[in-house]
Amino acid sequence: MGGFFGTVSKTACVADLFYGTDYNSHMGTKRAGMVTYAEGMGFMRSIHNLESSYFRTKFESELSKFKGNSGLGIISDTDPQPILINSHLGKFAIVTVAKVNNIPELEQDLLASNMHFSEMSLSKTNQTELIALLVIQGKDFVDGIENVFRKIKALARCSS
């Protein structure tokens, strides 16, 4: 399982991001990550293993290094996230909480299209990177996200 939290604000968002992501800590115990974006500075990212400690313990001392008005936080039981991508669409950060059921098929299609995978987890394709590669196949972000929905076969699940 896992959970993510995102925020875009007119003011600094780091505290909201930290507490919003921490709120999802019960959703997973393997890894956590945060990324913020500040105009003129770019992305600031940190990823930690949570198997021996809590989210707050790992990230609280780093909060001063994060700047910006937008950010993503993730609690993941699968891949280290967030990942940063630089593509023809521009630079972006991405997180996922998903169960992609057709990774081998998508992996073959992307490799046949001269794409590559650089984020491997336990010798398996990182599903977040796979989804990012599907996004960047689009002419813009909207087209790329629609491409993800067209190609991925996944288990849809909602929780409250």
Placement of each model-derived feature along the sequence:
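Conserved short alpha-helical segments that host acidic/polar catalytic motifs at enzyme active sites
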Residues: 1-160
